[in-house]
């Protein structure tokens, strides 16, 4: 079991898919679940603690748009307390193509910066023990929802970054895989803005397509964590879990 008795940091573990996934993780019996999120939700934390009293659930306020130095400082506090951390889940995300800079900052740069910060503690070249990174990306990283090109591009960037992390595992000792949900019924998709208002009804149109519940997505997320497959590109769509093959059109040969 990958989750049982492990120490896990979950960035944005109180959000839509994030909170349902936190529930499923707690059921699987980690030693510690550390949730980093922008807004504290004491009721949600209490619910997680009650779900499995054997699991220590803690919360720290965290905005993924802060600097690597600020993130490193927070992670040091966590590592000093827990001594070891086994898994980092990067789950922060927004869907609003009106907010171009913030979309990129949260969906991509935040993932890169949080990952960069934890490397100070995990990188085997620095004497670290290695670790596991699960990055929540999106099926829009495979094929864009063209009405929200900024969101789609930010998720494609996060996916590419994750694929590179996986290939760097022999050097760093840190493995990685991506979690790519399809259309999931969350507050994120009920109302959002298209880029330059190219399609005012984009949210409504999207929800006309088949969807999955947050619980279905969360349960498959936990299955992906337990599979612990470095480099996997997991598609979580319509209640199913599938490791997809990435088509290679070019190779640097280095």
Swiss-Prot record:
Per the UniProt entry, the Enzyme Commission number(s) are 1.1.1.1
* Family classification: Belongs to the short-chain dehydrogenases/reductases (SDR) family.
Gene name linked to the record: Adh2
Q: What is this protein called?
A: Alcohol dehydrogenase 2
Instruction: Give the record's subunit note.
Output: Homodimer.
Q: What organism is recorded for this protein?
A: Drosophila wheeleri (Fruit fly)
Catalytic residues as annotated in Swiss-Prot or TrEMBL:
151 (proton acceptor)
CDD domains named among the record's database cross-references: ADH_SDR_c_like
Question: What keywords sit in the KW lines?
Answer: NAD, Oxidoreductase
Residues engaged in binding NAD(+): 10-33
Q: Mind naming one GO cellular-component term on file for this protein? A: cytoplasm
Task: Identify a single GO molecular function assigned to this protein.
Answer: alcohol dehydrogenase (NAD+) activity
Positions bound to substrate: 138
* Family annotation (Gene3D superfamilies): NAD(P)-binding Rossmann-like Domain
């Amino acid at each position: 079991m990958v989750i049982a008795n492990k120490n896990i940091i979950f960035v944005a573990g109180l959000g839509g898919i994030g909170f349902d996934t936190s529930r499923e993780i707690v059921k699987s019996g980690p030693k510690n679940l550390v949730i980093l999120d922008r807004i504290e939700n004491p009721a949600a934390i209490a619910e997680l603690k009650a779900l499995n009293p054997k699991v220590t659930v803690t919360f720290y306020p965290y905005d993924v748009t802060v600097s690597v130095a600020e993130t490193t400082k927070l992670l040091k506090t966590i590592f000093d307390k827990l001594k070891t951390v086994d898994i980092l889940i990067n789950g922060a995300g927004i869907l609003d193509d009106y907010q171009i800079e913030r979309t990129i900052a949260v969906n991509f740069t935040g993932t890169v910066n949080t990952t960069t910060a934890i490397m100070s503690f995990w990188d085997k070249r620095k004497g670290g023990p290695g670790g596991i990174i699960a990055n929540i990306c999106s099926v829009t990283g495979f094929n864009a929802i063209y009405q929200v090109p900024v969101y789609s591009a930010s998720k494609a960037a996060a996916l590419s970054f994750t694929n590179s992390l996986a290939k760097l595992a022999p050097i760093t000792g840190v493995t990685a895989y991506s979690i790519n949900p399809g259309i999931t019924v969350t507050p994120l998709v009920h109302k959002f803005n298209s880029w330059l208002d190219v399609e005012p009804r984009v949210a409504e149109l999207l929800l006309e397509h088949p969807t999955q519940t947050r619980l279905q997505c969360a349960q498959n997320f936990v299955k992906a964590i337990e599979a612990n497959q470095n480099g996997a590109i997991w598609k979580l769509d319509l209640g199913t879990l599938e490791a997809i093959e990435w088509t290679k059109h070019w190779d640097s040969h280095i």
